[in-house]
Amino acid sequence: MHLQRIGALHTPFRTLADCPRNGRQPDPAPPCIAAVDPAFHDGLLALDGFSHLILLYWLGPQADSLQITPPFDGQPRGVFATRAPLRPNPVGLSVVAFDGMAGPGRLRVRHLDCVDGTPLLDIKPYLLSTDAEPGATMGWLAPHRTARGAA
C-alpha cells in the first residue's frame, strides 16, 4: 500500500500540546490553510459552492497500544472506539468549514485539530445526504457529550 500526500495543512498549532482535543472546541475556530501541491490543483475544479469539506491527513507516529485511557473518562478504551491520534494507521479526519480559496491551491478552512505542516492525504466534499446520520449514537461517549460535541 502506498499513500501520497497531496499537500500540507497550515494551522496555528506548533506542537501536539497546542492542538485542541477536537476542531470544534476553539470558539471562534482559527483560520487555517489546506495547501494543495501544484500537481493536484486540477482536482480542485468545482469545489467552490461547498460549505464543508472532509480532510484526511497523516497524524504521525503509529500507536504502541490498541487501548488508551481518555483523560476525561478514566476507563481503558479500544483505540477504534476513540478519536485518539495514536492509531495503527494514523489517518486523521476532520469535517471543516470551507471559506473559499485564498489563492491557487490554497483553501481557507476552519475546525482543524492538527499540527502545522501535517501532510494532507485527500479532500472530499461533505454531503449532508450521505455524511450525516440523524440517528447516530455516541456509545460510551454519550455521558460526556457537551454543547460542542464529545469531550
Give the ranges of each region predicted by the language model.
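Cys-His-centered catalytic/binding microenvironment captured across papain-like cysteine peptidases
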Residues: 1-93, 100-151
